[in-house]
Amino acid sequence: MKKNALRIGAVLVSSALLSTLVTPAHAHVSVVPGVSAAGNTTDALTVGRNNTINFRVGHGCSLEKDVIHPKTRRVVASAAIDKFATQAFTVTIPKSAMGEAGATFPRPAFVPGWRTTAKKNEDGSVTIKWRAISNDFALPNGPAGDTGASMYFDFGVRVAFSSATRGQRVSFVAQQTCLVDLPRAKGFPASRLPIYETWDGTADGADTVLDNNSRGPAPTVTVNP
């Protein structure tokens, strides 16, 4: 497990590279500050409205274990080799990043080719989801013909940090979804199997380390005092 810290102005941005027991998952989501409440891209994130943060998805998904076709029992995708494009990305905005008393609804950035939904949860947080409308708009693991390189994209959200977050770390649960194609077989229609990269502050346990849902530290920012 490797961790990186990126300091922009007075904002501390933490990120992590997640590895699995089988092969590095190449999962990397970090938070990059955008525009502060003062409208200045160089200011630290502050309490108030119009703070834009960008969740940078830096890689596609890889596998913790081989994917076996449920009908033919053949290996469809290999944990040691195959990588997959990002088809969906979700992030949960906590109440502490929704203004005083959680009254300011977060505003997601419009991403052409992706559908965006927002759902308010029972605890008052809001989960935002971007989903590619087709494979043509999915975020590939690397440029065509160059499997050794990775592409990235920033999913932006406008938030309002509450006064209780001054000088505090604010974490966001995020999840990246990729799809593995399962070919048609006799008595089995073609389908797609989701695999995940989840950043929620937990780690893979003995019972989950090979479930093709890698886990690691949640992307985090520190609000200016």
Regions found by a protein language model. Name each.
Residues 1-10:
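Bacterial N-terminal signal peptides that target proteins for export
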Residues 11-20:
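Bacterial N-terminal signal peptides
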Residues 21-27:
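Sec/Tat signal peptide C-region and signal peptidase I cleavage site
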Residues 27-39, 179-225:
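Extracytoplasmic/periplasmic copper-protein system
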Residues 133-167:
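Low-complexity, intrinsically disordered segments enriched in Ser/Thr together with acidic residues
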